[in-house]
Regions:
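Extracellular adhesion/carbohydrate-recognition regions
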Residues: 78-168, 253-300, 382
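Charged, compositionally biased non-catalytic regions
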Residues: 54-80
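Compositionally biased, non-globular sequence tracts
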Residues: 1-57
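Short secondary-structure boundary/capping segments
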Residues: 185-190, 250, 259-261
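A short local loop/turn or secondary-structure capping micro-motif enriched for an aromatic residue
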Residues: 22-24, 252-255
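Short aromatic-cysteine micro-motif
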Residues: 112-238, 242, 269, 382
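Interface-prone segments of viral and bacterial extracellular assemblies
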Residues: 50, 54-57, 73, 159, ...
């Protein structure tokens, strides 16, 4: 039997088993590190010689049980690991493992488990979330650094591409985005990002690597403050760059709907426009919630007879005439007062995208929400 723990910047790999198995896993990890080092040198023009990166990793291998079991604490009740997970095509994605947390631990709510950890009625001890905005390889999405994020695809086409990777793979869900946003708020590390044409609007020195002929930046190319916990190992680019799909929340004819808990992660959950996977978002007493838009003002309430229009404003100017732990778990509230809230409550269906884009300035952010987006839309600013 053998054990190994490899660390490379924010990426780690742990393996335990027969020596041959552990050796193969270590070799695969070191091969990825070498490729990453070469990509970094090529894309960043780094002066530092990274050719000996595998040797650096070898020197960091830890074989004692205590070190292997140790995990980094990121917030009360929340832990994560960074791991490489391979899909059915044999290509890795860099993923965070988040461990189960309750609403009480996360934002002072009830003792209920956060909905991101409840899938198909089963409570999971852990879930995995992409570290990077996804890029496309042979029609499948992957979480990899220093890549161009995928755009010009509809949410449903993107979701199906994710499901095609094999069991467990899925598009980022609204419940999972809520977990990330609530965790950032709890930590006091609301992420910065590409909000001003490859720079952060709050400090022009914070910038990512710009993609030629665009204002988008390569995935994970910004500083540590561009992650959910302000560490190099955090989840990147939740603020700005491109709007991101958050599958499982919509507004239809002014009413708010969501997939139950994190069932948007399941391919069998029917989230077509008339699908039975949609459930009303409710207040603390179980009343369905609606969004009224009148005179460029947005109000969340329980009244079905609402004024229907469309507009956008800062979350700090949104009226919340309801008490809903579900909205809090989904991070649909003024966690960032300047972040934008855009709503279309007119007739029809509009799905949720989040985070803001490269030109949204202070209106971008992990709490920025856009319920203004028909499911048939595809464009260069979201994906």
């Amino acid at each position: 039997m053998a054990k190994i723990l490899c660390n490379y910047f924010g990426l780690s790999m742990a393996a335990e088993g027969k020596s041959e198995f552990v050796g193969r896993q270590a070799a695969a990890f070191l091969g990825y590190v070498q490729q990453d080092a070469e990509r970094c040198a090529e894309n960043c023009g780094c002066a530092e010689d990274l050719s000996d990166a595998p040797e650096k990793i070898k020197r960091e291998i830890l074989r004692n049980d205590e070190e292997l079991r140790r995990r980094e604490q990121t917030a009360p009740g929340v832990e994560h690991d960074v791991v490489a997970i391979y899909d059915n095509a044999g290509i890795p994605s860099i993923m965070h493992r988040f461990r189960r947390v309750t609403n009480k631990e996360l934002f002072g709510g009830s003792d209920a488990v956060h909905p991101a950890f409840i899938i198909g009625g089963e409570v999971y001890d852990e879930i995995y979330i992409s570290v990077y905005e996804n890029t496309m390889i042979n029609g499948k999405p992957y979480s990899l650094p220093l890549q161009e994020p995928v755009t010009n695809i509809t949410m449903e086409d993107f979701a199906q591409a994710c499901f095609s990777k094999g069991e467990g793979w899925h598009c980022l869900t609204a419940a999972e985005w809520g977990l990330l946003a609530d965790t950032s708020l709890k930590l006091g590390t609301l992420p910065h990002g590409n909000t001003n044409c490859s720079h952060w609007h709050g400090d022009d020195k914070e910038q990512g690597i710009i993609i030629e002929d665009s204002y988008k930046t390569l995935t994970g190319s910004g500083p540590a403050t561009w992650t959910h916990d302000h560490t190099a190992s955090g989840v990147h680019d939740l603020c700005g760059n491109i709007w991101e799909f958050a599958r499982g929340v919509r507004i239809r004819d002014g009413a708010l709907w969501a997939a139950e808990n994190n069932d948007a992660a399941l391919p069998e959950t029917d989230l077509t426009e008339c699908g039975d996977g949609w459930k009303p978002i409710t207040d603390a007493e179980g009343h369905p919630l609606y969004v009224a838009v009148e005179d460029n003002k947005i109000t969340f309430n329980t009244y079905p007879s609402i004024h229907r229009d469309y507009c956008g404003c800062a979350w700090g100017n949104v009226r919340m005439n309801c008490d809903s732990e579900q909205l809090r778990a989904l991070a649909l509230f003024a966690g960032e007062e300047k972040a934008g809230c855009y709503v279309d409550s007119t007739e029809g269906e509009y799905i949720l995208i989040r985070g803001g884009g490269w030109g949204y300035g202070g209106h971008a952010g992990v709490f920025s929400s856009y319920l203004y987006h028909p499911r048939s839309n595809a464009g260069g600013s979201f994906g």
